[in-house]
């Protein structure tokens, strides 16, 4: 038996897992698995929304872009994980992305170590890739609901 914080009620472990912990598990799955409609995870969708909102045609440090995204797209999971998502979206070695939407400028990782050897986000730069403008109209139609409420899409 365990107790809830601030109460004297007891709660069995099975009740805790089936009623309380399940909410975290569902939320974690939503953050971890890309959406079938656009292929983005919520963090990637917020990155693209912020890049289009800023009209990111010139280079910006990955650390600065992460700060901009967390401020303007209500990202609440820490800038370190956001920086990692930006780095993964810009990787262009064989086997990393089908189509990278962000242009890498600097050491964004290598195939040998699976991208884990990327430089620190304060030393590498990125901007929108040229191909992104070609698919921009389709991406914007999926990202538009973010503009109003600044929250994840619900399909």
Where are these regions (language model features)?
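Catalytic phosphate-handling regions of large nucleic-acid enzymes and associated NTPases
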Residues: 1-155
């Amino acid at each position: 038996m365990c107790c809830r914080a601030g109460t004297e009620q007891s709660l069995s472990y099975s009740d805790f897992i089936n009623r309380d912990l399940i909410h975290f598990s569902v939320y974690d799955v939503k953050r971890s698995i890309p959406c079938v409609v656009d292929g983005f995870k919520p963090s990637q969708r917020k990155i693209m929304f912020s890049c289009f909102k800023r009209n990111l045609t010139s280079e910006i440090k990955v650390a600065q872009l992460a700060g901009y995204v967390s401020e303007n797209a209500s990202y609440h999971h820490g800038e370190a994980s956001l920086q990692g998502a930006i780095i993964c979206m810009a990787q262009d070695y064989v086997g990393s992305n089908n189509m990278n939407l962000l242009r890498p400028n600097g050491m964004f990782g290598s195939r040998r170590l699976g991208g884990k050897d990327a430089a620190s986000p304060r030393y590498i730069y990125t901007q929108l890739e040229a191909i992104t403008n070609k698919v921009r109209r389709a991406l914007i139609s999926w990202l538009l609901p973010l503009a109003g409420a600044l929250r994840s899409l619900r399909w």
